[in-house]
Amino acid sequence: MPFCLLDVDKDIPEREQHIYIKDSKEPKGHCKQRCNTNTIPGSMTERGCAFAGVKGVITGAIKDVLHVVHSPVGCTAYGNGTTKRYPTRPEMPDGSVFPVENFNLKHIVGTDLTESDVVFGGMNKLKKVIREASKEFPFVNAIYVYATCTTGLIGDDLDAVCKEMQAELGKDVVAFNAPGFAGPTQSKGHHVGNYTIFEKLVGTKEPPKTTDYDINLIGEYNIDGDYWVLEKYFEDMGINVLSKFTGDATHGELCWMHKAKLSLVRCQRSATYVAKLIEEKYGVPYLKVDFFGPEYCAENLRAVGKYFGKEIEAEAVIKKEMEKIQPELDFYKSKLQGKKIWISAGGPKSWHLSKPIEQYLGMDVVALSGLFEHEDGYEKMQERAKDGTIIIDDPNTLEMEEVVEKYQPEIVLGGIKEKYFFHKLGVPSVMIHSYENGPYIGFEGFVNMARDIYTAIYNPAWKLMEFEEEEPGDSNE
Amino acid sequence: MPFCLLDVDKDIPEREQHIYIKDSKEPKGHCKQRCNTNTIPGSMTERGCAFAGVKGVITGAIKDVLHVVHSPVGCTAYGNGTTKRYPTRPEMPDGSVFPVENFNLKHIVGTDLTESDVVFGGMNKLKKVIREASKEFPFVNAIYVYATCTTGLIGDDLDAVCKEMQAELGKDVVAFNAPGFAGPTQSKGHHVGNYTIFEKLVGTKEPPKTTDYDINLIGEYNIDGDYWVLEKYFEDMGINVLSKFTGDATHGELCWMHKAKLSLVRCQRSATYVAKLIEEKYGVPYLKVDFFGPEYCAENLRAVGKYFGKEIEAEAVIKKEMEKIQPELDFYKSKLQGKKIWISAGGPKSWHLSKPIEQYLGMDVVALSGLFEHEDGYEKMQERAKDGTIIIDDPNTLEMEEVVEKYQPEIVLGGIKEKYFFHKLGVPSVMIHSYENGPYIGFEGFVNMARDIYTAIYNPAWKLMEFEEEEPGDSNE
Amino acid sequence: MSELNVIKKERTAVINPIVTCQPLGAMYAVSGIERGMPLVHGSQGCSTFVRYGFARHFREPADIAVTSLHEDAAVFGGRKNLISGLGNLAARFKPDVMGVVTTCSSEIIGDDVAGFIKTAKVEIAKKMGEEAANKIKIVQINTPSFVEHQFKGYDNAIKAIVDTLAEPKDEENGKLNIIPGIVNPGDIREIKHMLSLMGVEGILLTDTSDPFDSPLRPSKADKNPYYQKGGTPLADLQDCANSLGTISLANYANSAPASLEKKYNMPSKVSEAPIGIQNTDSFIRTVKKFTGNDVTDEILDERGIVIDAMADVASRYLFGRKVAIYGDPSITVGMARFVAELGMIPKVVCTGVKNEYFVNDLKKVAKESDEDIDALFGQDLRALDVYLKENPVDLMIGSSDGRLMAKDLGIPLYRVGYPVYDRVGYQRRPIIGYNGALNLVDGITNTILDKYYETQDWKLQQ
Amino acid sequence: MSELNVIKKERTAVINPIVTCQPLGAMYAVSGIERGMPLVHGSQGCSTFVRYGFARHFREPADIAVTSLHEDAAVFGGRKNLISGLGNLAARFKPDVMGVVTTCSSEIIGDDVAGFIKTAKVEIAKKMGEEAANKIKIVQINTPSFVEHQFKGYDNAIKAIVDTLAEPKDEENGKLNIIPGIVNPGDIREIKHMLSLMGVEGILLTDTSDPFDSPLRPSKADKNPYYQKGGTPLADLQDCANSLGTISLANYANSAPASLEKKYNMPSKVSEAPIGIQNTDSFIRTVKKFTGNDVTDEILDERGIVIDAMADVASRYLFGRKVAIYGDPSITVGMARFVAELGMIPKVVCTGVKNEYFVNDLKKVAKESDEDIDALFGQDLRALDVYLKENPVDLMIGSSDGRLMAKDLGIPLYRVGYPVYDRVGYQRRPIIGYNGALNLVDGITNTILDKYYETQDWKLQQ
């Protein structure tokens, strides 16, 4: 029986289907693990909402758009600054410079809905706010407008408002209809983001110039500078990133994604949709890529190189970068060999990272989990796990406590909400959603992650955790 | 009877002669107040030692010399950084730039005398240290060497050592023989500093260029930027400060003081000696000047202007500066009118400031005192005081407590050692030796001082000093 | 001079808000109950954003459950979610108190929360047995997100807790109820410290100090489930009906005191945060008045040490410097009064709320300090940003949400309030009371020295 | 790895010293006695420079008298000065204890200090009456400036105080003697706090916490003459012969413990400053051992809060960063051990003393931390400056005397030790004990964030 009902779940036995223990004797090597379903109420999930999925993950990384959240003040407040760490540079594709650096981290607009808006509808207020916002930040290249629970429930028609305002303001005004309650997780928001951008933006603008080596880099959000790492590799290979979706991107880039020669899909959970749609409509093929860990990174650079006939350049990059990191990799492996790890990312990172962490750091992956991963993702986790590894969809805090007890991970890669909880159990935790001292992607990023894992495990605090009643022998006596 | 025996002095009745209460019915208008005598042991004086007088006051302000203190480590440690605030700029008179900014605040050298040096003498060690120091800071233009109590008592001949080292190193090496126990106060150190500089340095170098309007500015140490204020006025008048003694000065400037057309003596306690000697030997006349307070500042700029036929320029400076400060002066006067003040400077500032503080700030000077002032200074204090003012030579802490009780000053201008003592008695105190937010000289400096007095008196802490058992009427009830 | 110039928002839009919605305040309040568990009746974002925020600020876990409303609830209502949510939480966590926190969704849907809670109680009793079920208290807290802000949510929560749980007895307990407001663990510890110096036992309504700043001691921790240490015990909450009086230290938290006063004839006092000397003095006097206990020399010595620090540094380094203060309506007003006590000028005070107590409290500060104060009222950080571009100040005081603005404006920021996530330890350092004032004197002065004195470093020689 | 590389001074010259001479340590020690008055037998500079230094650091008055030796004393000896100095001080200040602190001059002149004190006692008795005179104790403290440094002076002073004043009784007093070393008021308060959490009463030898951090309360102050509040009462000093044991928290202060051990068969322990977790643990264990009292949960919870902070921030922000530490031989060694506990590398530790305990304590740190440490031994700030130009580090930890050097090197400075005059409040914030460690974690982390994270400010978003 590959499924597992944890002791803490005896009152919510539905959870059994979400928790799988890898057993390679399974006929198909994997097993349909339940996922992407609604969380059981009251079970202390780590999941977020659809609004977080679209604004927090997809659109919040764009440098030159203004976000208008149609909501009571709370959603706007929570949408500000982004919960991830998405830096942007002010440089624009046409060589100009956007007037505010990290604009995406600095400003957000909301309609501040109150009781009477709830009663009488908020569409007029929304229009007014969009006008004001446009006046306040006239230099933005587009305005994105977000539905929330409140406006979803009162039934405001955001598309109609945005259409009207786009005509009035002469710049793109785009509605994202992903109210918080939509879908079981933030993944619904990713989905809405993808479709909206495809339907309303892709194909509507032309790039200032194109080359034969233009790519879309899709699902790369520049968390803590991830994109800037990859950018260097592509530059070295002579490949031009025409459009990012959406890390350090401009609004314009989204509009001319149809002009690339190839799409690369980096985060396959949040962004495959848009790549597929672009392929279907515009014939731009896409590759699913993985740049986490030296081997995947090398493999995928090779694949891209091959596609563009840049095999030599790819090899050169790989060689150069590997040489740089090898000594550090060796050091961290010597320190981390055999240490038990639980990777609890949002989704894909749990399977991106499991092999590289085993291979390059010698660590023992004892548990994997995802917050909003879908079936294909769990298949990959299952495939990549060794026998006995526990794989959990949407783990709740009580389950986490039990897993720590039973599997005794020596480190957990997780989110900030769980981090301090694990600490209280005496287990170090490194933030895998937005990193500690990232970036974590690419060759050097993997070393950064290794270092963060290393420092977390070797933090002397863990050894000093409990007061010793007896003076240690080699002490100051 | 103009002298006064305070209640706290009943056990040390000698103090009566040091404390005078102004009485204009005195035949001569003033009275020979005892001063510049040894402090009574155990009476908690605020005075320092002769070493502090020479290094801390006179020589520590020079930008390009290295100081070697021939002492156990303590004197060297205390001599570091200077107790006053003497900034220097790296610009040199010949247009070059000294390699270290504020060098005078950053480095000091000592011979670190130990028991065996005390027994066998420290002269060889001193030589070794001077050699090392010269090697460590080869760019300095001179090395000044200081006797201290220890070396004074063991009888090391510093002049001999310096003579030898000067020959060996090819740069000026000058001994200052002012061991801590010499003389009743730091004033002895000033004296030694003056004579030594005159005898060993003045007349030994020639300036890179001279003009018809060259002056020596003597006794101006650039406390918190004082000199830089005066420098502007002289520049505006077309007068060239050929040598400072010693604020922001170079060693070279001291050596060519004989080439000025006129010496101005700013601090008349610490530096008149050298001006007199220069006049006697080289015929450079000197003027005693006072730039504290608008009126004295104006008067003395006029006197200098007159000397050089620059009356018009002087008037222009005075007019410009007065216009700038008048509104602020008016404001502070409105706030400080009638407030009782005790001016307890080292010496001259007590008489420099008493009149301007009365005239421009409308304050009531109730007490004056000096730490190391001589007879001529007390004469001036007596002359400038109104009837009933208490004038104290070398006040000790118990006397201070009694004066606070009896004269109820609302502010004391004093030193940092006394400052916090006065605070504990509920009386604000502003540091007059090295200032709070200076400079205090010149027109704008006087406004700075007025502001510091104003903020000290109006610090809301004084009103909040005692807890009120009853809720005030207009409060938050 | 000494005018309060109230500047209201002219925009309809809110840009870079400095308030958030009601539920956060309620989640904060319930987190201060020992084995207390907030259950947010809404979408997952409603709890997750707040847990994220608490984790980031306190660097501690924040256990907040959610009923995970989805499309089906939007159509059919949240009955099933709330009842099963309460049931699951009760069975798995065995909390002492569950606080049901509504949101925009559950309020718009129009769920009969009271009815659902009743049903849930029955089901819990069925499952866990009557006795076990009775030990678990459920507090209904209505916090519609589209009305006011987190401060109102806090006020609603404290009132709901008190109204639901208080159990009057015949005798007074000799204690004092204290409503601390949305403050930091360090502040609550300082309140308790002051009470202990006055020989007074307090009932904190509620006490987040330990839950949001807990020792890392796995060997001693509550496990299966893990609970953070501390919080106000249920027994104390029940006992709050029998106290000598109620003091609210947040000007927005006045409903529970009023309710206690009305029901149990208990004296109460509501003020802005006791930040600075006069506000703390006033708090101490109220404690004395309600308890009859004397003001001890020990506490006055602590006061004297702040006064000493103020005498030593305020006039020398701080006087006349202009300050912009933003955030919480109670803390900002307290801070404004205190910076005036330091001789600084609280040039502009910005809050996101629109309640009159903010204006009234600030008028008093303007009068006392003899300075004109601009009050950005019901405003946002963008308004402050625009204001400061025209009217620069020497120092900003507020949360980390103003950090990038401060950096762009070139104005140093002293961090106060919630959230502070870009530096560490601020949650532990009180700003309340005499010791809080001492921290502020040191922190503000050092910020000024860093920025304005290091350029002329010789000035720092003494 | 884990080698201690001892680098001794090659120069004869001392350049920018980080130690000063013995009398300072003695003046500090006597200042910690209630109504205790140091009388420096030397030139005026000997007391004035120190009073200046104390005023600048503590921002408090420091009452230190001097015998004002001048030329005549150099020739005829300081007899008159010392006898009249003691007489005047006794008559005018009515102190409980006068500590006669010698200097280079009085030692070189060869004054018979013991004899002069005897004579002075007779004269005081004549003047004030036998009874009043007997109440005033005189302690002779020999502190020749040309031998060692202020730490030796402190050690000599504590020993002299104990040897002169201790009065054995038949029964133990159940207390613990604590020699804190030259530390700050905040440190001593933290020591007392820890003892109180352990239910132990301490006799501080001596207690400068109140004298160097006194409330400003004119209405309650001792006047005519004004005395700062607090200090160890004479009765406690006399009672120190009857304690359960003596703990010295400064590795250089070992003479008094040895003397007490020898005379009264009292157990003692001498360690480096209890900075950081292991050193504080060790202190707590010693308290337990000497008193038999249990280690309470309260103190372990405070410990757990530091551990929590370290778990949260050390690996994330501090790990692997190189640190230069300079100053006091006991504090630097404690700091080195603590920064290693934070995962940082105590790359270089610089002190001005030449005592072996410094080297031995550091060897232990090197071994534990598995890092090479360079020990600048018997060195000065210039040596550190030259070293750091070749071997840059990420952080400097030490007194304000390194501030201009740090600025020129572009290395941030976290201020610790004596003196700190260019920022405020450091004298009140402990570095000792668990709460001291907590302050250090916060302070060091914020310094690192300021310098190395603000340039990539998005990293501070969570």
UniProtKB/Swiss-Prot annotation, chains A, B:
MF terms (GO), sorted A to Z: ATP binding; iron-sulfur cluster binding; metal ion binding; nitrogenase activity
Cofactor: binding comment: Binds 1 [8Fe-7S] cluster per heterodimer.
Residues in the signal sequence: none
Alphabetical list of SUPFAM superfamilies matching this protein: Helical backbone' metal receptor
Keyword Ubl conjugation: no
Key words of the record: ATP-binding, Iron, Iron-sulfur, Metal-binding, Molybdenum, Nitrogen fixation, Nucleotide-binding, Oxidoreductase
EC number: 1.18.6.1
Record flagged with keyword Metal-binding: yes
InterPro entries: Nase/OxRdtase_comp1, Nase_asu, Nase_comp1_asu, Nase_comp1_CS
Cofactor: [8Fe-7S] cluster; [7Fe-Mo-9S-C-homocitryl] cluster
Entry-linked Gene3D superfamilies: Nitrogenase MoFe cofactor biosynthesis protein NifE, C-terminal, Nitrogenase molybdenum iron protein domain
Subunit structure: Tetramer of two alpha and two beta chains. Forms complex with the iron protein (nitrogenase component 2).
Function: This molybdenum-iron protein is part of the nitrogenase complex that catalyzes the key enzymatic reactions in nitrogen fixation.
Similarity comment: family membership: Belongs to the NifD/NifK/NifE/NifN family.
Listed name of the protein: Nitrogenase molybdenum-iron protein alpha chain
Annotated source species: Methanococcus maripaludis (strain DSM 14266 / JCM 13030 / NBRC 101832 / S2 / LL)
From Swiss-Prot, chains C, D:
Cofactor note: Binds 1 [8Fe-7S] cluster per heterodimer.
Keyword field: ATP-binding, Iron, Iron-sulfur, Metal-binding, Nitrogen fixation, Nucleotide-binding, Oxidoreductase
InterPro entries: ChlB/BchB/BchZ, Nase/OxRdtase_comp1, Nase_comp1_CS
Positions annotated to bind [8Fe-7S] cluster: C21, C46, C104, S145
Catalytic activity: N2 + 8 reduced [2Fe-2S]-[ferredoxin] + 16 ATP + 16 H2O = H2 + 8 oxidized [2Fe-2S]-[ferredoxin] + 2 NH4(+) + 16 ADP + 16 phosphate + 6 H(+)
MF terms (GO), sorted A to Z: ATP binding; iron-sulfur cluster binding; metal ion binding; nitrogenase activity
Enzyme class: oxidoreductase
EC number(s) per entry: 1.18.6.1
Gene Ontology process terms (BP): nitrogen fixation
Cofactor: [8Fe-7S] cluster
Pfam families assigned to the protein according to its UniProt record, in alphabetical order: Oxidored_nitro (PF00148)
Family to which the UniProt record says this protein belongs: Belongs to the NifD/NifK/NifE/NifN family.
Biological function: This molybdenum-iron protein is part of the nitrogenase complex that catalyzes the key enzymatic reactions in nitrogen fixation.
Assembly information from the UniProt record: Tetramer of two alpha and two beta chains. Forms complex with the iron protein (nitrogenase component 2).
Protein name as it appears in the record: Nitrogenase molybdenum-iron protein beta chain
